[in-house]
């Protein structure tokens, strides 16, 4: 699997915000309406919209419109891809060249 480093750098930047990490944790329990997420954080609707836009643009979250409300769920395909990529980045074989370097 070839890694798109620019794409994953953007995803990790999105994940670097504690509030967005907590939103992902909340969504791990299943789909949630935006109003439930907003209640948890006691934030304004524009602030929530900004965070959810970043999560959706990263591909980690799927939006679903129902009337005037938006419901959010984890994109499990993208989450599994993220887990595999992190694993690939952390494989010992990836670091052997660095460990064997004689120029220290």
Question: PLM features: what roles do these ranges have?
Answer:
Residues 3-46, 66-80:
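N-terminal helix-turn-helix DNA-binding core of bacterial DNA-binding proteins
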Residues 2-7, 76-104:
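Amphipathic alpha-helical dimerization/coiled-coil segments
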Residues 39, 56-57:
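Alpha-helical residues within the helix-turn-helix
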Residues 51:
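Residues within the DNA-recognition helix of helix-turn-helix
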């Amino acid at each position: 699997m070839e890694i798109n480093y620019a794409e994953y750098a953007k995803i990790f930047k999105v994940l670097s915000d504690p509030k967005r990490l907590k939103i992902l944790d909340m969504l791990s329990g299943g789909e949630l309406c935006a109003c439930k997420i907003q209640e948890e954080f006691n934030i304004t609707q524009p602030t929530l919209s900004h965070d959810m836009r970043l999560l959706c643009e990263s591909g980690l979250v799927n939006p679903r419109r129902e009337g005037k409300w938006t419901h959010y769920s984890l994109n499990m395909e993208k989450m599994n891809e993220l887990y595999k990529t992190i694993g690939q980045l952390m494989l010992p074989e990836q670091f052997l060249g660095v460990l064997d370097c004689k120029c220290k």
